[in-house]
Structure formats: structure tokens, C-alpha cells
Amino acid sequence: MSKMRINLGQIIVITMLVLAGAGAFLFGYTLEERRDEAEIKSLVSGLADNLTQTETESTASALIKVKAVADAFADPMTLAMDKYAFGDYDRDRLLASMGRYRALVKSAKVSASDIRITITEKEKANGTFAGRFEGTLKSGPGDVIIKDIDAEFVKTEGRWKIKSLKFTNVLH
């Protein structure tokens, strides 16, 4: 009988240790996933901030923002934005497009809202968010554009980057 108690006691202790280990693993995995989601949301918000442009922005500030935008994307990346931009972009093409954007736009306020991220694999994620552009072109007219955006993200060298963006019209 005492051997049975010892064995039963050992089994209970081992079972508790296994359950505690599994719980710690799940807790750690959940924390890492939340940390990745927060990092991706910060990436999207930072991209919107760096696409924002004021009339009085210095050249140095503009160059820093252009570099930050390019750094937010994987190389190559895919863009599907109506008539404005479509296809695969390497870093050089992306930088050239950013230069054209900044040359055409007098001022712009860009924002991202309702950012939802799903980690699909250890180094891959999908997301959706609403993007809003309110700006004035140097040629005069202003516009407000609101789009739903589907995004794919990849983690390279320990950092999340945008792999693709697909813009769709928002129904009013």
C-alpha cells in the first residue's frame, strides 16, 4: 500500500510538473504573439506617420521619412493600389516612387485605424486596417481618400516588414 502511495504521489507530482511546463510554454507563446502583434501595429502606425507631410517640412526630415518608409517594407514587396501603384517593387523602385509622391504632394495627413493582425506562422502574419489620406497636391486640388487595406508581413532579421499591401475601395 505504501509503495502505491509513493507511486501515486510521484505520478501526481510529475503530472503537475508537465502541466506547469505546458502552461508556461503556452503563456510564453501567447506573450510572443502579442509582442509581435504590437510590433506590427507600431510598424503600420509608423508608416502612416512617415507618409504624412507638412508644407514646412525640412529636406532633412523628408529624407529621414523616405528612408523610414523604405525600411518598413520587405525587398521585394508587392503593391496593389488602383491606378496609383501596382506590381512588385524592389527598394530602388520604392524609393523612386516615394520621391515622386513627395514631389507631387504639398501636404498630407495619413493615418491607419482599426488595425487587426493575425500571426499565421512564426515569421508570417496577415493584417487588415483602414487607411486614410487627406492632402493637397502642389498643383492645387485637395482630396480625402479612404481605403481598406489587406497586408502581409514577414519577419526578416528579427524585424517585421510589410511584404504586400492591397488597397480596396470603402463603400460609403
Language model feature labels by segment:
Residues 2-5, 11-12, 29-33, 126-128, ...:
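Short beta-strand edge/turn micro-motifs at domain boundaries
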Residues 13-72:
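Short, low-complexity N-terminal intrinsically disordered segments enriched in polar/charged residues
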Residues 34, 38, 60-63, 85-95, ...:
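Soluble non-cytosolic domains of exported or imported proteins
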Residues 45, 49-53, 74-78, 99, ...:
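Sec-exported extracytoplasmic/periplasmic mature domains
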Residues 67-85:
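Short, solvent-exposed secondary-structure junction/capping segments
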Residues 74, 112-114, 162:
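Hydrophobic residues on conserved beta-strands that form the core of alpha/beta folds
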Residues 93-139:
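Surface-exposed, charged secondary-structure patches
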